[in-house]
Each structure stands twice: as C-alpha cells, then as structure tokens.
C-alpha cells in the first residue's frame, strides 16, 4: 500500500502555521523524508489526526486498505552525449600508441506517478489519490582511454588498454505533488497539494553530488598466420 502514511506519521505535531512548502523543507531537515511524506498525506486528507489538540501525534489512515486499483507510471526523456578527442602516435615500426579524451553531458527529466482509485468500500472517505514526483537531472563528466600495441615479431602483436573511470558532477532538482479526492456520501472535495513558497512559486529542492564509474584494464594478443 504506497499510501500507508500512518507508518510515517507517528510523531508529527499538528500545531504548525507555516506555508506548506516551507514547512515541508523544515520537516525534511529535522525529521527526514518519511516525515515529509506523512505531511503531504495529512494535508491531502490521506491520514487524519485522532484528535485536534495541538500536541496530537497519532493518525489514522483514510483509506480502507482493501481492494483498489493502483496505477504506476514512469516517464523519462532527455539525452546522454559523449564527445571524443582522439590522438595517435607511433614509435619506430613496432610501438603504436593511442589516446581518447571524452567529455560527457547528461540531461534527463523524469516523472514518477502512483495513482489509486476505485476503492472497494461502497462509500469510502478517500476516493482518489495521485502522488507525482518530478526529477530533473543534469551533469557533466570526463573520461579517457589509453592504448598501446607492440609489434613483437612480424607475426605476433601484444596490446594493452586502460579505460579510466568516468568522473561525473551531477545536479538534481525535485518536487512533489499530491492530488486527492475525499468525500462523504455524494459530496466530494478535491485537495491538490503542491509545494509552493509564500509567493505561489513552485519549490524545487536541489542537491549536488559526484560519482565515478569503475576503471578497467584490457590485455590482448594476436598472431598472424601467413
């Protein structure tokens, strides 16, 4: 059940007056990602406080945890570019050298969506829920390859090559939206929870990180049959 926010909600205090987006950021720094998800569920009506007292930290699920329709969707678009700069040299008639310098460029946009509807109960309080997470990733990287072939005899060739790691520097921007519909009898209420600042602008959360891929050595041999 991807909307079992009751698991995450223990310990969240109902008494807060900040903007949704700003409080979401503060909650993440203090309590972590699980608490942020519980907060979105609370604002959308997926979980409800057991009491309305300021010090309440106990919540109940709005969903019935019975049969429902779940839809998962992932959309990705973007590109990965690689630019090569090649160099070659020869020493005498028996040593051949080569080098590639590579520049990498990444730009990807992704949408992760989880939707639930068609709840089994005849008159459920929670009618519809759709959590969306947008992630934009950009980055640059560098790598190189070195290689050499040695002509041992007219028939025998020995080779060795080195593939360096690809060193990446990445930047990731993300934002979340939670849409929900709740209702009693024939009356329904739409709750669209978007993370915005006090001026109404969407809030994107940024993080930067570095990583590298493994390196590799390769050896080879060839014998020419005349």
Regions found by a protein language model. Give the residues of each.
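Outer-membrane beta-barrel porins/channels
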Residues: 1-226
């Amino acid at each position: 059940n991807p909307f079992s926010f009751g698991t995450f909600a223990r310990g969240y205090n109902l008494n807060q007056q900040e903007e949704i987006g700003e409080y979401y950021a503060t909650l993440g720094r203090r309590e972590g990602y699980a608490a942020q998800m519980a907060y979105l569920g609370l604002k959308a009506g997926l979980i409800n406080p057991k009491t309305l007292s300021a010090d309440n930290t106990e919540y109940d699920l709005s969903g019935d945890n019975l049969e429902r329709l779940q839809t998962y969707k992932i959309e990705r678009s973007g590109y990965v570019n690689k630019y090569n700069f090649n160099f070659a040299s020869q020493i005498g008639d028996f040593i051949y050298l080569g080098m590639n310098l590579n520049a990498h460029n990444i730009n990807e946009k992704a949408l992760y969506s989880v939707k639930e509807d068609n709840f089994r109960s005849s008159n459920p309080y929670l009618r519809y829920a759709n959590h969306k997470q947008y992630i934009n990733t950009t980055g640059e990287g560098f790598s190189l390859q070195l290689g050499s072939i040695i002509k041992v005899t007219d028939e025998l060739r020995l080779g060795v090559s080195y593939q360096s790691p690809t060193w990446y520097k990445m930047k990731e921007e993300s934002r979340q939206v939670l849409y929900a519909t709740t209702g009693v009898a024939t009356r329904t209420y739409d709750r669209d929870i978007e993370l915005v600042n006090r001026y109404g602008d969407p809030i994107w959360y940024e993080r930067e990180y570095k990583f590298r891929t493994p390196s590799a050595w390769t050896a080879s041999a060839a014998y020419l049959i005349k």
